[in-house]
Amino acid sequence: MRFREQFLGGSAAMPGATLQRACRLLVAVCALHLGVTLVYYLSGRDLSRLPQLVGVSSTLQGGTNGAAASKQPPGEQRPRGARPPPPLGVSPKPRPGLDSSPGAASGPGLKSNLSSLPVPTTTGLLSLPACPEESPLLVGPMLIDFNIAVDLELLAKKNPEIKTGGRYSPKDCVSPHKVAIIIPFRNRQEHLKYWLYYLHPILQRQQLDYGIYVINQAGDTMFNRAKLLNIGFQEALKDYDYNCFVFSDVDLIPMDDRNAYRCFSQPRHISVAMDKFGFSLPYVQYFGGVSALSKQQFLAINGFPNNYWGWGGEDDDIFNRLVHKGMSISRPNAVVGRCRMIRHSRDKKNEPNPQRFDRIAHTKETMRFDGLNSLTYKVLDVQRYPLYTQITVDIGTPR
């Protein structure tokens, strides 16, 4: 009996002492675990190594390792070296050598400068679609009136999308037609006002990526339309990578915005039915007034001739060049291709060229050495107005 009491008394004391020591050990291990966890959290180290360092089984971790710790889906692990997510409302501290600023590139040797990074926007993330082949903005036949008063300042305010120098591109689509419109010019300010008044809205409705270049011949020597067009081609390419060139007289206005001021697979004659000629084509070879050539087509014929001083002949020479290079002329129908001409008397120093018929007869020979490869001129002034760019040039004198 005494033996039993001694045994029971001893056994009652032993479990209490043992449990107390076990609890102290468990508290110490938990404190160590908490301390190591805190240190690793603040330093951004990999928490997946904690069980190996503290020697605590996954059962004692209580699900703080792996996917459960970062709320990751089962089977996914945080990459080695990745920072654990901070508590809600707490911003992560930068890591020396890795984070130079919030949002910096996370990797050694990578530099970040927030001021140089583009700010993501809806338009920046989503690329614009290509403009449709036929613009939905066209209205068709239009009334052209040359008796209205035109104020260029007011016109510029009504067309805020036009950039300085007469540059425009659609804001809601990307146009494949990068068009430079070249106007040979001298002393036609009133005509230019009407041209800008009517053409800018038309070109915008056609959804073209375009620029307007007025090539102004300085001095009072004989006018040379074709040479000015060559100059316009070269000068426009200094501004932008145009792929199409429309060559337009300043006194011609289209009466239908379906008459496209752009390039096609073949050279395009745009002013096919002028009121001056009773809204009909004067002759099959006629290529004057307004025409369009792609960059490749223009280069293939060595540009336009430089030796047609005075009125007439150069458009027929251009037609011959195209035919000799195996090209054909594309035209709109006589309804869409209607144009109005601003009536005016013939300019001084633009009298008919008496040599034009002889020169036209020899186009096949002269086109090899008369054109872009023989073009000489001097730019005297460049003015970029709100609605157009004017380039004043000295083109020399007839030889």
Swiss-Prot record:
Q: Where does Mn(2+) bind?
A: 251, 344
Record-listed N-acetyl-D-glucosamine binding positions: 313-316, 356
- What Gene3D superfamilies has UniProt attached to this entry? Spore Coat Polysaccharide Biosynthesis Protein SpsA, Chain A
Q: Which GO terms describe its biological process?
A: acute inflammatory response; angiogenesis involved in wound healing; apoptotic process involved in mammary gland involution; binding of sperm to zona pellucida; branching morphogenesis of an epithelial tube; cell adhesion; cell population proliferation; cell-matrix adhesion
Disulphide-bonded residues: 131-173, 244-263
Q: Which residues lie on this side of the membrane: Lumenal?
A: 45-399
The EC designation for this entry is: 2.4.1.-, 2.4.1.38, 2.4.1.22, 2.4.1.90
* Gene Ontology cellular component list: basolateral plasma membrane; brush border membrane; cell surface; desmosome; external side of plasma membrane; extracellular region; filopodium; Golgi apparatus
Query: Cofactors per UniProt?
Result: Mn(2+)
Its pathway, per UniProt, is:
Protein modification; protein glycosylation
Q: What is this protein called?
A: Beta-1,4-galactosyltransferase 1
User: Which source organism?
Assistant: Mus musculus (Mouse)
The uppermost taxa in this organism's lineage are: Eukaryota, Metazoa, Chordata, Craniata, Vertebrata
